[in-house]
């Protein structure tokens, strides 16, 4: 390979957005370079057939001794995530430090005088700990599965009632294993803030649980963009307007990549609105009920009649888990999707959830097993209203022309 190669190395890169981000920042072509083994990573650096690369899990610590010169901050942290080839000599940097500092600042997080719990002991742990330490944290605790080398176990960490800030540096909850969580945030009475360096999905289970409790919480997407902008400065040797670029690229990419999920009572028009909205947004439209029928080979009324509602909800939960892991979709959900607690978080992990509202007397009820109209429909609405409210990020009135409803949805998504 020529020394014009720019890209990302790591063991598994199927989750990466780095190519999209870097090609918005600068005019080089950025290549994803999965290297499954340490031997392959060492050989890659030894050949030096690249211009500049970013380094991700699990090679940030391995990369450091492969460099001829290492930036003092990266050396102090013990991890390198940016390597630039200048005339055959490799220069190592750590832009994760500035990226995480940007994330914290963007969400008003002040580490001064705080007790911080960092989950995980890998390369990113050292980076996060350095930012917290430099920010004046009173105490920095570490938790891991094993509790070795001075770390707490996750069970011990949950008993530390003085923890005020939690930062996850592990891959737990990352695509495709979304929905996983290492810590019960409800066990920490003084907890104020949760930051998660995982960026895919946009909101991990840990972040969603924190938001449910009214805490300041954010995933790692802004950190990803920030460290990429700072890395691009090393790649190109030119200063960039990072204060403008980082929020601009973060907004643009999240809007492009995010799902839009529609929930609401059966017959409120989710599928009709969703198909039209997807066309306007240039996203793929998916009807969750149709996907259930495709997978089971049965019509939904037949599933209810032959197997019961509990079986249907299991099929539905599997479909929702799969669909919401993906990106660039408009997803129309069945009316009862919010009855399953796991679904309510899954729906929110990769974008906004719009609650489509329509007067009960205008709901279509034909062919809907649990929605027959009259008193039963009113009782269903009463039961589900708080669940829709808890799951939704915005409400969308669908009581007029389709074009007006779609226009209102586009306004909500600005």
Model region roles, listed by residue range:
Residues 2-107, 201-203, 209, 213-216, ...:
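Phosphate/diphosphate ligand-binding glycine-rich loop within oxidoreductases
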Residues 10, 92-97, 104, 109, ...:
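Glycine-rich adenosine-cofactor-binding loop
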Residues 134-152, 289-296:
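NAD(P)-binding Rossmann-fold cofactor-contacting core
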Residues 150-218, 337-343:
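Rossmann-like adenosine-cofactor binding region
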Residues 197-258, 398:
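Adenosine-phosphate binding glycine-rich loop
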Residues 246-255, 276, 280, 386-414:
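NTP-dependent small-molecule kinase module
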Residues 290-348:
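ATP-dependent small-molecule kinase phosphotransfer cores
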Residues 349-387, 391-394:
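A glycine- and Lys/Arg-enriched "phosphate-lid" helix/loop adjacent to the NTP-binding pocket
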């Amino acid at each position: 390979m020529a020394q014009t190669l720019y890209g990302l190395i790591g063991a598994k890169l199927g989750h990466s957005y780095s190519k999209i981000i870097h090609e918005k920042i600068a005019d080089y072509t950025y290549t994803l370079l999965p290297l499954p083994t340490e031997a392959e990573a060492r050989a890659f650096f030894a050949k030096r057939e690249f211009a500049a690369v970013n380094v991700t899990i699990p090679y940030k610590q391995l990369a450091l001794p492969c460099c001829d010169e290492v930036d003092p901050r990266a050396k102090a942290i013990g991890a390198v995530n940016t390597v630039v080839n200048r005339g055959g000599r490799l220069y190592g940097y750590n832009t994760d430090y500035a990226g995480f500092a940007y994330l914290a600042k963007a969400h008003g997080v002040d580490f001064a005088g705080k007790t911080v719990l960092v989950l995980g002991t890998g390369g990113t742990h050292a980076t996060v700990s350095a930012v917290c330490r430099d920010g004046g944290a009173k105490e920095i605790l570490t938790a891991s599965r094993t509790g070795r080398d001075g770390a707490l176990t996750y069970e011990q960490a949950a008993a530390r009632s003085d923890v005020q800030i939690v930062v996850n540096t592990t891959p737990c909850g990352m695509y495709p294993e979304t929905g996983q969580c290492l810590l019960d945030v409800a066990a920490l009475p003084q907890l104020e803030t949760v930051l998660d360096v995982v960026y895919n999905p946009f909101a991990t289970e840990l972040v969603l649980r924190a938001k449910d409790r009214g805490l300041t919480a954010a995933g790692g997407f802004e950190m990803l963009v920030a460290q990429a902008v700072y890395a691009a400065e090393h790649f190109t040797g030119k200063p960039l307007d990072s204060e403008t670029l980082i929020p601009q690229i973060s907004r643009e990419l999240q809007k492009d990549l995010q799902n839009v999920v529609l929930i609401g009572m059966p017959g409120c028009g989710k599928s009709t609105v969703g198909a039209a909205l997807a066309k306007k947004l240039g996203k793929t439209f998916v009807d969750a009920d149709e996907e259930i029928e495709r997978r089971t080979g049965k019509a939904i009324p037949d599933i209810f009649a032959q197997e019961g509602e509990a079986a249907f909800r299991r099929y539905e939960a599997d479909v929702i888990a799969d669909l919401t892991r993906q990106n660039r979709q408009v997803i129309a959900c069945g009316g009862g999707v919010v009855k399953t607690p796991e679904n309510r978080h899954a729906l929110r992990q990769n974008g906004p959830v719009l609650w489509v509202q329509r007067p009960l007397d205008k709901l279509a009820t034909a062919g809907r097993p649990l929605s027959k109209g009259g008193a039963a429909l009113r009782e269903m609405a009463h039961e589900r209203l708080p669940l829709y409210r808890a799951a939704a990020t915005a409400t969308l009135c669908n009581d007029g022309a389709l074009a007006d409803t779609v226009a209102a949805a586009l306004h909500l998504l600005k």
